[in-house]
A protein has these predicted regions:
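Glycine-rich hexapeptide-repeat left-handed beta-helix
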Residues: 1-12, 46-54, 60-62, 66, ...
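N-terminal segments that cap or nucleate solenoid repeat domains
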Residues: 1-37
Length: 178
């Protein structure tokens, strides 16, 4: 797994966390127990810290970056879907950011809230606890409870923790055939 120090700051990864071999962590990045960082994800904590809390997951091809003014915190059991950008924002516990979404500077996604796939959460936007936001720019549409999307917020934390442990135990690079 590519881990790089930056100006004396080095990534700190818990032994039970899964970091895919093609993920890249740079600088002041903390990945807590049972969290997972998936293939081709990049977490660049060069100007401020990035903290990925226990059991959270940052999926394939996502980018997490900071600014000189703010870092990133991804709450316990939160999900950053495939191909997302999280920039100097905060995600609450068990929040879910759907595939292909962008969450910009100073945005706050509440506990068990969901940002639908493809959404653009503009700077300083707040998605309150338990709410569903969608669109470009993202707007809060109402409570997540009782919607089909609620399943993913509930299922993703445990599902990705189990899948990460399987990858941690069995992923191995293979030689290319000649």
């Amino acid at each position: 797994m590519p881990l790089f120090s930056f100006e004396g700051k080095t990534p700190n990864v818990h032994p039970t966390a899964f970091i895919a071999p093609t993920a890249v962590l740079i600088g002041d990045v903390t990945v807590e127990a049972r969290a997972s960082i998936w293939y081709n994800a990049v977490l660049r904590g060069d100007l401020n810290p990035i903290v990925v809390r226990e059991g959270a997951n940052v999926q394939d091809c996502s980018v997490v970056h900071v600014t000189a003014r703010a870092g990133v915190e991804i709450g316990r059991g939160a999900t950053v879907g495939h191909n997302c950008t999280i920039h100097a924002a905060r995600l609450g516990d068990e929040a879910l950011v759907g595939n292909g979404s962008t969450v910009l500077d100073g945005a706050r996604i509440g506990t068990r809230a969901m940002v639908a796939g493809g959404a653009l959460v503009t700077p300083e936007t707040e998605v309150p606890e338990g709410m569903l936001a969608m669109g470009t720019p993202a707007k809060v549409k109402g409570p997540l409870a009782g919607t089909p999307a609620e399943f993913w917020v509930k299922a993703n934390p445990e599902g990705y923790q189990k899948l990460a442990q399987r990858h941690l135990a069995s992923v191995a690079e293979v030689a290319r055939g000649v």
